[in-house]
UniProtKB/Swiss-Prot annotation:
Belongs to the influenza viruses hemagglutinin family. One of its GO terms (cellular component) is host cell plasma membrane. It is a single-pass type I membrane protein. It comes from the Viruses. This is Hemagglutinin. The chain crosses the membrane at residues 531-551. The lineage of its organism: Viruses, Riboviria, Orthornavirae, Negarnaviricota, Polyploviricotina. SUPFAM superfamilies: Influenza hemagglutinin (stalk), Viral protein domain. Residues 1-16 form the signal peptide. Palmitoylated. In natural infection, inactive HA is matured into HA1 and HA2 outside the cell by one or more trypsin-like, arginine-specific endoprotease secreted by the bronchial epithelial cells. One identified protease that may be involved in this process is secreted in lungs by club cells. The record marks R345, G346 as: Cleavage. The keyword ATP-binding does not apply.
Length: 566
């Protein structure tokens, strides 16, 4: 009895070899695209989150933590502000005649000379910073009847009382202070920057002790401008043991113009002029250390790479820098739509095309073919369609960078207290610009991502249509990205389809003949193999049960006798 059941099972297996799908006279060819187990989510115009095989981050969100000393010339202010270095504070003498691309002011900087103020501090600081030099030329001003080179215990230069090295403090000689009237023409071809000041004594006694007159006056003129300053005598908060002050002013003399200085007291006179240069130099407040490295873009947080189009490290930048945006991340799709491969393809390992899912492990191309024929299964990439897609995507990042990177610096903007409304307006304008750029950046990236996904989908469809045109009536579109080929197609035949040399006329008669031999009922469901095999297995099982029942009935009736020998 067991022998009969075993023979029945062997018969079923033998019969199974003739089921559809195991016919050596047909083959299956599927087209598909690359996929990865875990893709990257990006935003497009039509979808906030769509998964792609690869994406590049466009927002630089961190700095190196140090300011690179190359290719820009960095001048570290250390303990000196730019204005202190300009005036010649004793502890800033090392900055005389220095040059820079970027002057870095530190929070620890301090003044260590006569207390002063600059009524237009921000403008002077910006003017000198953009000039990029502290180159100073001494001139021989003719001050008559007065004592020069005044000093103070608040401004020690070594053990001696001193003063700002670029300024000349004039006071009475004996008991007189004659009116000073000095001219200095500009016969050069460049602008000259003159720094001068007015002394405001603490008391009337200090005023007359230094300048004789109870009230002094200083007038500085050129052909284009005139400034008249009257000292304000009075007590002020004590700084470094002094209650008096010096106010610093500045005048630019154009080529061919002339500087005229008139004063009857309280004049802090210039010793010469600073050369004015035009350029892209600037100043930045930062406590980041100076490091030996190379970076085109500098922020107060430190240098950052400029290989991305956007950054959210700091609004203040110097050099060729990414555009500042509010977003922490913006991802640019550099791969195709990702549809991870299903882990199981049925109990007989059926293959599927791009309409169902992508293919993982296809590392030699983005698009390719899988086949199943009498020689087994195989896979190969289609390099031409892959290269077409890559060529169009390559350079996308560089084009975005070219559109957005600033080839100039975004300097700090400062205003005096009386210009508070202007400062508020400027801040509003800057914030609006940032909001606008942030929106534009998100829109630009979404458009590029949409284009990339549409492009890669289009290349897949082009390859599928190219294959369909080759096969014509020799194959049937299975609806899942695969073709059922109705003739024997070995590996060489599959290769000819891939490389475009397939001749459908050679196989036409065989394919048509096989088409007409289709069994009576052909299931179109994607689960037809499952249903066929389950139905066949049940049929075999029932056949065995019936046969076993017949044998047992015959034995019971005596029609069949079973002898068991030991």
């Amino acid at each position: 009895m067991k022998t009969i059941i075993a023979l029945s099972y062997i018969f079923c297996l033998a019969f199974a070899q003739d089921l559809p799908g195991n016919d050596n006279s047909t083959a299956t060819l599927c087209l598909g695209h690359h996929a990865v187990p875990n893709g990257t989510l990006v935003k497009t115009i039509t979808n906030d989150q769509i998964e792609v095989t690869n994406a590049t981050e466009l927002v630089q969100s961190s700095s190196t933590g140090k300011i690179c000393d190359n290719p820009h010339r960095i001048l570290d202010g250390i303990n000196c502000t730019l204005i202190d270095a300009l005036l010649g504070d004793p502890h800033c003498d090392g900055f005389q005649n220095e040059k820079w691309d970027l002057f870095v002011e530190r929070s620890k900087a301090f003044s260590n000379c006569y207390p002063y103020d600059v009524p237009d501090y921000a403008s002077l600081r910006s003017l000198v910073a953009s000039s990029g030099t502290l180159e100073f030329i001494n001139e021989g001003f003719n001050w008559t009847g007065v004592t020069q080179n005044g000093g103070s215990s608040a401004c020690k230069r070594g053990p001696d009382n001193g003063f700002f090295s670029r300024l000349n403090w004039l006071y009475k000689s004996g008991s007189t202070y004659p009116v000073q009237n000095v001219t200095m023409p500009n016969n050069d071809n460049s602008d000259k920057l003159y720094i001068w000041g007015v002394h405001h004594p603490n008391t009337d006694k200090e005023q007359t002790d230094l300048y004789v007159q109870a009230s002094g006056k200083v007038t500085v003129s050129t052909k284009r401008s005139q400034q008249t300053i009257i000292p304000n005598v009075g007590s002020r908060p004590w700084v470094r043991g002094l209650s008096s002050r010096v106010s610093i002013y500045w005048t630019i003399v154009k080529p061919g113009d002339i500087l005229v200085i008139n004063s009857n007291g309280n004049l802090i006179a210039p010793r010469g002029y600073f050369k004015m240069r035009t350029g892209k130099s600037s100043i930045m407040r930062s406590d980041a250390p100076i490091g030996t490295c190379s970076s085109e873009c500098i922020t107060p947080n430190g240098s950052i790479p400029n290989d991305k189009p956007f950054q959210n490290v700091n609004k203040i930048t110097y050099g060729a820098c990414p555009k500042y945006v509010k977003q922490n991340t913006l991802k640019l799709a550099t791969g195709m739509r990702n549809v991870p491969e299903k882990q199981t393809r049925g109990i007989f390992g059926a293959i599927a095309g791009f309409i169902e899912n992508g293919w993982e492990g296809m590392i030699d191309g983005w698009y390719g073919f899988r086949h199943q024929n009498s020689e087994g299964t195989g896979q190969a990439a289609d390099l031409k369609s892959t290269q077409t897609a890559i060529d169009q995507i390559n350079g996308k990042l560089n084009r975005v960078i070219e559109k957005t990177n600033e080839k100039f610096h975004q300097i700090e903007k400062e205003f005096s207290e009386v210009e508070g409304r202007i400062q508020d307006l400027e801040k509003y304008v800057e914030d609006t610009k940032i909001d606008l750029w942030s929106y534009n950046a998100e829109l630009l990236v979404a458009l590029e991502n949409q284009h990339t996904i549409d492009l890669t989908d289009s290349e897949m469809n082009k390859l599928f249509e190219k294959t369909r045109r080759q096969l014509r009536e020799n194959a049937e579109d299975m609806g899942n990205g695969c073709f059922k080929i109705y003739h024997k197609c070995d590996n060489a035949c599959i290769g000819s389809i891939r490389n475009g040399t397939y001749d459908h006329d050679v196989y036409r008669d065989e394919a048509l003949n096989n088409r007409f031999q289709i069994k009576g009922v052909e299931l179109k469901s994607g689960y037809k193999d499952w249903i066929l095999w389950i139905s066949f297995a049940i049929s075999c099982f029932l056949l065995c049960v019936v046969l076993l029942g017949f044998i047992m009935w015959a034995c019971q009736k005596g029609n069949i006798r079973c002898n068991i020998c030991i």
